[in-house]
Swiss-Prot record:
Keywords: Chaperone, Cytoplasm, Nickel insertion. It holds the Pfam family UreF. This is Urease accessory protein UreF. Transmembrane segments: none annotated. The gene is ureF. Required for maturation of urease via the functional incorporation of the urease nickel metallocenter. Its main location: cytoplasm. GO terms for cellular component: cytoplasm. Belongs to the UreF family.
Length: 228
């Protein structure tokens, strides 16, 4: 088994590499409005996000970031590629609907950059203190030589695992139910990942009005951050 194949497990762990925390991303609002009542409703929420949520756009940008890193490594159009990298990063970060979600992204990105630095890979734009989570994820996968498809699959898996970790604390659904949901999500994660591979950014449709409204209450609810 290759080293890169083993390193991907470090990335997808619900406890690592981002300091053993996960964010509920507005899940409490769904609970407050009685839209989350059991494991089935949690599963449906996560599936809907995988099918039409903004997480799809985040996943698609992983590919663009990955290709830019590749061109920079080959010495192609350094100035232009760095500008494109920064522009895409600022764009995806600004697309987040609330300050809390943007700060969450920055926090998680910093933790992942710290991890890759410990492995000997210092990020190209180290002076940029406000990067997005997708950028940091793509950088880690590029450094660890993880394939593009695995990069997207792992991204979706890690995101869904964190949502389930949050659900365990606020509903709760129970650890066994959470594991069963994660198992049931594998097929949709595989399907959606392959779809993302074949699409351009402009072809990615997402509608997250419900999630955006839920996140508006993020700063007023008591369980926005969990530490393991």
């Amino acid at each position: 088994m290759s080293k890169s194949h083993l390193l991907k497990y470090l990335l997808i762990s619900p406890n690592l590499p981002v300091g053993g925390f996960c964010y509920s991303e507005g899940m409490e609002s769904y609970l407050h409005n009685k839209n989350l009542i059991d494991s089935n409703s949690v599963k449906d929420l996560i599936i809907n996000e995988l099918k039409i949520g903004q997480i799809r756009l985040d996943a698609r940008l992983l590919l663009d970031f990955f290709d830019i890193f590749d061109e920079i490594n080959e010495g192609k159009n350094l100035k232009g590629n760095l500008h494109k990298l920064m522009s895409l990063d600022k764009w995806i970060l600004s697309s987040k609907d609330t300050l809390e979600i943007r700060e969450q992204q920055i926090q998680m990105a910093k933790s992942l950059f710290d991890l890759t630095k410990e492995f000997g890979f210092e990020y190209l734009c180290k002076n940029n203190k406000k990067s997005s989570w997708p950028l940091a994820w793509s950088w880690a996968c590029y450094c660890f030589k993880i394939t593009k498809l695995e990069m997207i699959e792992n991204f979706f898996y890690s995101w869904s695992a964190n949502q389930l970790s949050a659900a365990l604390r606020i509903i709760p659904i129970g650890a066994t139910k959470a594991q069963l949901i994660q198992r049931d999500l594998l097929a949709i994660i595989s399907k959606v990942s392959k779809e993302i591979m074949d699409k351009e950014i402009d072809d990615i449709y997402f509608g997250n009005v419900g999630l955006a409204m839920a996140q508006q209450n993020h700063n007023d609810l008591y369980t926005k951050l969990f530490r393991n």
